[in-house]
Amino acid sequence: MVESVVKNWQGEQVGQKTFELRVAKETTAAHIVHRALVRQQTNARQGTASTKTRAEVRGGGRKPWRQKGTGRARAGSIRSPLWRGGGVIFGPKPRDFDLKMNRKERRLALRTALVSRIDDLILVEEFSNELSRPKTKDLVAAFTRWGAEPESKILLILSEFPENVYLSARNIENLKLIAADQLNVYDLLHADKIVVTTSALEKIQEVYNG
């Protein structure tokens, strides 16, 4: 059971909200979060790097000079890895870096990562109605009132993206918007401050507590 203060648009405390997210045991928490983080980063790799071996490089079928009598070192192909333009020894080949992780484990890692950041989590009321029109300056001022400095890395979690909020937020350099049902471990751990709306928190409990 976790309790967090709820702030309004002006940055004033207007109540408290209790929420419950099942997390990993203390002995295994770091391990499961680390596994989820490694999985996310490795799965983002393209794995398309490729080099040619001496068998794949064009040419080199003819022996460049006879074996003996020239005074030069013996050579069997101009595509030897020792030659410029030759094949590559043990170079990269296309491969699949994907790591498997059960959905239950992934969700457990997400919940554990989120709860571990409770000291940096700022819970706010819905504020889309406070922005009568898209205005980055107003949203930056709101973050400051909430205790999240605009220079810091901020993760803003919303249940949905109203156009005025999206347009106000997209030009803030260190801000990342994410939907409540699209969370990932890297963003939760990477942010300095995590700002969550009350409706987004309810959606997180609904989606990830299953």
Swiss-Prot record:
Which NCBIfam families does this UniProt record tie to the protein? rplD_bact (TIGR03953)
Taxonomic placement: Bacteria, Bacillati, Cyanobacteriota, Cyanophyceae, Nostocales
* UniProt keywords, alphabetically: Ribonucleoprotein, Ribosomal protein, RNA-binding, rRNA-binding
Q: Write down the Pfam families for this protein, in alphabetical order.
A: Ribosomal_L4
Ranges of Basic residues composition bias in the record: 60-71
Q: Which SUPFAM superfamilies match?
A: Ribosomal protein L4 (SSF52166)
* Source domain of life: Bacteria
The UniProt function text for this chain reads: One of the primary rRNA binding proteins, this protein initially binds near the 5'-end of the 23S rRNA. It is important during the early stages of 50S assembly. It makes multiple contacts with different domains of the 23S rRNA in the assembled 50S subunit and ribosome. Forms part of the polypeptide exit tunnel.
Polar residues: compositionally biased ranges = 41-52
Record's protein name: Large ribosomal subunit protein uL4
Kindly list the GO molecular function terms attached to this UniProt entry: rRNA binding; structural constituent of ribosome
Its gene name is rplD
Region annotation Disordered: residue ranges?
41-71
Which InterPro entries does the entry mention? Ribosomal_uL4 (IPR002136), Ribosomal_uL4-like (IPR013005), Ribosomal_uL4_dom_sf (IPR023574)
On subunit structure and binding partners, the annotation says: Part of the 50S ribosomal subunit.
The family annotation for this protein states: Belongs to the universal ribosomal protein uL4 family.
